[in-house]
């Protein structure tokens, strides 16, 4: 925010809200634009991977444009599976512990086989595990996320 006046002189527009995180504001902007508008988000925030599930949204990490293939190569999942992956394996940066005994490789394996947490057979997660994944997913979901 301290650079906003300089940006205004250059003609930049900005959006700021004391009650929202940057990724929430970015999501609001993405959903407010017409679906035929190409949107490129420049951020290293992994939470924004979920926005790549929208057909008109691309993510650039300041090094390169990310694609479904790059996300798959890094995580073994698609952008649409990112929330389930994070809910299972956890994310220290966001204080999401995930499910005990499930790390990135196991989450990748399960999602490869069952696609979503909703398709997991009952023996894969106990009742507590199911409730926890729903909680972590709800906490991790950027507002306005549409499945």
For every predicted segment, state its role.
Residues 1-147:
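Extended two-metal-dependent nuclease catalytic cores across DNA- and RNA-processing enzymes
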